[in-house]
């Protein structure tokens, strides 16, 4: 079991939470993490790049010079690929799929590894259950960050569905990223300096890995 410090919504220490060790690994697997982040980055590529081939470049319909008796190499168009302003041979077209396959077990191993790194570095905190604000308030979330000594830190706040007011309250905080527990990726975890996870999210993660 791992012990996580839970904070109240005002940013002060509330209690300790024992989290199942199934969420962590003994030794973080760097290759699994690398593969997961690489696949996530690749999946965001839209593949809208498009170059023009010889037949698509404007102009070049007239033969530059006659075929014979000029002393120059024969050519049929000024848009041939070896000419300046010519088409591109085998250039990228917008039908390429950049998605990379990562097995589910590898993705889970990568996620556990990222959680383990944050835990070992002391960069993982919790948020007590039922901590959503009554109304959206950026000021209260600023107080939370200040009281928790998280100023000038890139904070990842992992919440559950019924924490909508906290989500709205952090929209204007530049260094705070708020995501639902099932939207968090390995890249999100590694990009953040500190990860604050809602108590309900720990329960959901534990239920997920136990399947």
Swiss-Prot record:
Keywords: Ribonucleoprotein, Ribosomal protein, RNA-binding, rRNA-binding. One of its GO terms (molecular function) is rRNA binding. InterPro entries: Ribosomal_uL4 (IPR002136), Ribosomal_uL4-like (IPR013005), Ribosomal_uL4_dom_sf (IPR023574). One of its GO terms (biological process) is translation. Pfam families: Ribosomal_L4 (PF00573). GO terms for cellular component: ribonucleoprotein complex; ribosome. This is Large ribosomal subunit protein uL4. It comes from the Bacteria. Belongs to the universal ribosomal protein uL4 family. The keyword Ribosomal protein applies. Residues 44-90 are annotated as: Disordered. Residues 60-72 have a biased composition (Basic residues). Part of the 50S ribosomal subunit. One of the primary rRNA binding proteins, this protein initially binds near the 5'-end of the 23S rRNA. It is important during the early stages of 50S assembly. It makes multiple contacts with different domains of the 23S rRNA in the assembled 50S subunit and ribosome. It comes from Ureaplasma parvum serovar 3 (strain ATCC 700970).
């Amino acid at each position: 079991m791992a012990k996580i410090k839970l904070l109240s919504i005002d940013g002060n220490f509330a209690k300790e939470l024992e989290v199942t060790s199934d969420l962590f690994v003994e030794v973080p697997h760097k290759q699994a993490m690398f593969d997961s982040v690489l696949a996530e980055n690749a999946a965001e590529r839209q593949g809208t790049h498009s170059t023009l081939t010889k037949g698509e470049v404007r102009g070049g319909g007239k033969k530059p010079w006659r075929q014979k008796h000029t002393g120059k190499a024969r050519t049929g168009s000024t848009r041939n690929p070896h000419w300046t302003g010519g088409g591109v041979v085998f250039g990228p077209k917008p039908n390429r799929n950049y998605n990379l396959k990562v097995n589910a077990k590898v993705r889970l191993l990568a996620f556990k590894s990222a959680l383990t790194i944050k835990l070992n570095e002391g960069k993982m905190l919790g948020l007590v259950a039922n901590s959503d604000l009554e109304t959206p308030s950026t000021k209260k979330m600023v107080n939370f960050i200040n009281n928790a000594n998280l100023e000038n830190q890139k904070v990842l706040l992992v919440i559950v569905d019924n924490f909508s007011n906290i989500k709205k309250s952090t929209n204007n905080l530049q260094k705070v990223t708020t995501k639902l527990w099932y939207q968090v990726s390995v890249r999100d975890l590694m990009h953040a300096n500190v990860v604050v996870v809602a108590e309900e999210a720990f329960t959901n993660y534990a239920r997920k890995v136990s399947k």
